[in-house]
Curated annotation (Swiss-Prot):
It comes from Paraburkholderia phymatum (strain DSM 17167 / CIP 108236 / LMG 21445 / STM815). The keyword Ribosomal protein applies. One of its GO terms (biological process) is translation. Keywords: Ribonucleoprotein, Ribosomal protein, RNA-binding, rRNA-binding. InterPro entries: Nucleotide-bd_a/b_plait_sf, Ribosomal_uL23-like, Ribosomal_uL23/eL15/eS24_sf. Belongs to the universal ribosomal protein uL23 family. This is Large ribosomal subunit protein uL23. Part of the 50S ribosomal subunit. Contacts protein L29, and trigger factor when it is bound to the ribosome. The lineage of its organism: Bacteria, Pseudomonadati, Pseudomonadota, Betaproteobacteria, Burkholderiales. SUPFAM superfamilies: Ribosomal proteins S24e, L23 and L15e.
């Protein structure tokens, strides 16, 4: 864990954006989890350290997944949206991240 904490510059690049969707909102209300879009090469340990550093909360666990990009048609050409790596961050009881307050 101390090896991950040493490089704070790397941790600032791990979290790309919070995922604000219907599913992410339901997960946040039910299970005290927050969903982030993360860098494609980010590890669970880096995501945990980045969330703890940026939001000053305690993280219980991290689950990651890679959402494959959809195949889309651009005129007569077929293209593909980029793959997105998401992290479901489970916070310890009593902890929460309020994005409205963080933005102000």
């Amino acid at each position: 864990m101390s090896e991950v904490r040493k490089n704070d510059h790397r941790l600032m690049q791990v979290l790309l954006a919070p995922v604000i969707s219907e599913k992410a909102t339901l997960v946040a209300e039910k299970n005290e989890q927050v969903v982030f879009e993360v860098a494609p090469d980010a590890t669970k340990q880096e995501v945990k350290a980045a969330v703890e550093l940026l939001f000053k909360v305690e993280v219980n666990s991290v689950n990651v997944l890679v959402q494959k990009g959809k195949a889309k048609r651009f005129g007569r050409f077929m293209g593909k949206r980029k793959d997105v790596k998401k992290a479901y961050v489970c916070l310890k009881p009593g902890q929460e991240i309020n994005f409205e307050a963080e933005a102000k």
